[in-house]
């Protein structure tokens, strides 16, 4: 009995020593993990270099192509088919080698909003996903899915629900493969200047675009001295910008507010060129050059669905910058 009691005591002692050893190992592992975590810096945001593209829904693709190709003079280098169909799902309108407009041949997902999304170019999609994940966005590690056009890309939503895409252009993708081609002299403009879209809460929008994405505020404008109308936010590593179209009450139609602005050297000459084209007869709307609140010449056109395409000169009419508005933003209803 004494031997069995001694064996039991030794067994209990061994179990206790083993448990203490496991606890010590666990504590050491936790300590090492904490030290490693302290050493590893938070993921850094990769470069956001510009606007890659903007997408719009169209109800009649042939008419939309007449507008973009016949009137504005841009080429359609490639298309994507609808799933399980030979029908065109997306038509790509090439603006330059790094920018395009996507025409979605389908009903809008959230009418009357005809803007599908806006996409920004980044130099590393995997790093962008890691950066946003560290900022609380629900994103899995990795490059994300390859698009049908052959590039790495993923999407999130901004505070207003606008779909925001980030793309890393790959050498094997359709855009890179088309570099240097599909750039006819008929193009009325050679670049996307900015993209404008509705924003209801400017404070939340600034927290997202400035605090998270690193965009820089470059100008504020007002159509009225009592309330702010627009905030321009430039990408952190380029010259392209987005324009917050501020509102208190959501408008009944979005087409005038949600727009793409194309840069032209001479707005009056652009009007003359457009009016001389056969497609202008079917366009059927007068073209008028105006001076915007930002002091720049601009011309507004509308696609067959009412989405605004703005032609804008890059400089002010007198060469002097227009001061930013100090009016308060509208109170979102």
Residue ranges of predicted features:
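Core segments of cupin and vicinal oxygen chelate
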Residues: 46, 55-100, 134, 196-241, ...
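Vicinal oxygen chelate
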Residues: 36-47, 49-59, 91-94, 107-191, 197, 219-222, ...
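Ordered, small/hydrophobic-rich secondary-structure cores
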Residues: 40, 54, 72-76, 80-150
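Bacterial N-terminal signal peptides
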Residues: 19-30
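Bacterial N-terminal signal peptides that target proteins for export
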Residues: 3-20
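Structured core of small recognition/catalytic domains
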Residues: 203-206, 210-290
């Amino acid at each position: 009995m004494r031997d069995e009691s001694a064996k039991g005591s030794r067994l209990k002692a061994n179990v206790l020593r083993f448990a203490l050893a496991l606890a010590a190992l666990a504590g050491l592992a936790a300590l090492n993990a904490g030290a490693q975590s302290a050493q590893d810096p938070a993921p850094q945001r990769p470069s956001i270099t510009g606007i890659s593209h903007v997408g719009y829904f169209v109800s009649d693709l042939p008419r939309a192509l007449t507008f973009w190709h016949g009137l504005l003079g841009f080429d359609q280098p490639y298309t994507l088919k609808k799933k399980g169909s030979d029908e065109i799902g997306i038509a790509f309108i090439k603006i330059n080698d790094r920018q395009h407009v996507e025409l979605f041949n389908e009903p809008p997902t959230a009418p009357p909003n005809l803007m599908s999304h806006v996409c920004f170019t980044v130099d590393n999609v995997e790093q962008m996903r890691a950066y946003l994940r560290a900022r609380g966005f629900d994103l899995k590690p990795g490059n994300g899915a390859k698009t049908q056009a052959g590039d790495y890309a993923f999407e999130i939503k901004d505070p207003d629900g606008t779909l925001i895409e980030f793309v890393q252009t790959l050498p094997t993708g359709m855009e890179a493969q088309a570099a240097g081609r599909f750039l006819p002299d008929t193009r009325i403009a050679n670049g996307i200047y900015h993209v404008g879209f509705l924003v209801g809460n400017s404070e939340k929008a600034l927290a997202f675009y400035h605090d998270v994405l690193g965009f820089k505020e470059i100008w504020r404008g007002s159509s009225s001295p009592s309330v702010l109308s627009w905030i321009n936010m430039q990408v952190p590593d380029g010259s392209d910008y987005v324009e917050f179209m501020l509102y208190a009450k959501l408008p009944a139609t979005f087409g005038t507010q949600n727009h793409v602005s194309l840069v032209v050297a001479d707005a009056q000459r652009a009007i003359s060129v457009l009016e001389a084209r056969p497609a202008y007869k079917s366009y059927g709307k007068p073209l008028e050059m105006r001076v915007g609140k930002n002091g720049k010449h601009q011309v507004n056109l509308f696609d067959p669905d009412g989405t605004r395409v703005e032609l804008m000169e890059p400089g002010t009419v007198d060469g002097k910058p227009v001061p930013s508005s100090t009016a308060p933003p509208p109170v979102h209803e």
